């Protein structure tokens, strides 16, 4: 076993304790350099450039069943942990693809933030029902606020003081963008902790570092992949060794057909868990996507949800299903749930709803300077 990472695939067992040395100055300052800001902007520009697809275009995607599987995983997480009237904070909310999932959970209030201006505008029009999205749904039942800014850099507790505390925070397929530096990782977790109520939950999905590193070490070169994805590491990782004392800023280039083509960063889960504990966020579970599917497909209600979403076909007319390459790509990801220490007093802050609106104009979007 090489230093810093386990060679075994992810499991639901708690990861080992972190062996990296924490920032001795704690989280008193989160300083960003220009290189980090440029990386964040590059990622934002990538997602802003992605246009909304029609239903026909979406169904023709070479990874349509992988997308549906990921939607199923997010839907299951939301159904497991969201309660009626919950206040939700959606970090890196993108184009609002999860709005309908939250609506079905009958939440009471929604705040979404994303760094990409184009994505936030698409989210606004989707929420308003102005765009002809494939959901064909015109009205959501909860008031909302939208913010445009880098949630891994700005202090959100000051900006959202009147909206907090939140019952649930979600960050789907984006947490790894905070792992460029320890400062950004700390800011991300500090924001989550500061805005969650005691007993509140943080749900998310992100790349599984154990799987990626295992595949890299099994490969002949510095690239892994198949017909739907590839991952390429730089020559600085030619020895395929990663120091446990330097778990931030481990960059690779990730390409996923019809979805992603930009730099990403390894998140060693043992470090993520240890850092989260510093911010009073305790691990409830972590599961690789394969394990997640096998476990929750044992429950009839989630089997029916899978059928409706069509990731494995609909069981009748649509006999298509995930390809072997899509299933392998799914193995690259994990789901996690953290809970903030403490017990909630059970009180609901109905006043926070006044900060949201049922229809959002462009002027209603709050732009946050980094």
Swiss-Prot record:
The record marks 95, 101, 126, 176, 264, 333 as: mRNA cap binding. Gene3D superfamilies: Vaccinia Virus protein VP39 (3.40.50.150). S-adenosyl-L-methionine binds at residues 74, 92, 114, 150-151, 172-174. It is found in: Nucleus. One of its GO terms (molecular function) is RNA binding. Residues 61-341 form the mRNA cap 0 methyltransferase domain. Residues 1-11 have a biased composition (Low complexity). It catalyses: a 5'-end (5'-triphosphoguanosine)-ribonucleoside in mRNA + S-adenosyl-L-methionine = a 5'-end (N(7)-methyl 5'-triphosphoguanosine)-ribonucleoside in mRNA + S-adenosyl-L-homocysteine. InterPro entries: mRNA_G-N7_MeTrfase_dom, mRNA_G-N7_MeTrfase_euk, RG7MT1, SAM-dependent_MTases_sf. Its main location: nucleus. It comes from the Eukaryota. GO terms for cellular component: nucleus. Residues 1-34 are annotated as: Disordered. MRNA binds at residues 70-71. Its EC number is 2.1.1.56. Keywords: Methyltransferase, mRNA capping, mRNA processing, Nucleus, RNA-binding, S-adenosyl-L-methionine, Transferase. CDD domains: AdoMet_MTases. mRNA-capping methyltransferase that methylates the N7 position of the added guanosine to the 5'-cap structure of mRNAs. Binds RNA containing 5'-terminal GpppC. Belongs to the class I-like SAM-binding methyltransferase superfamily. mRNA cap 0 methyltransferase family. This is mRNA cap guanine-N(7) methyltransferase 1. It comes from Arabidopsis thaliana.
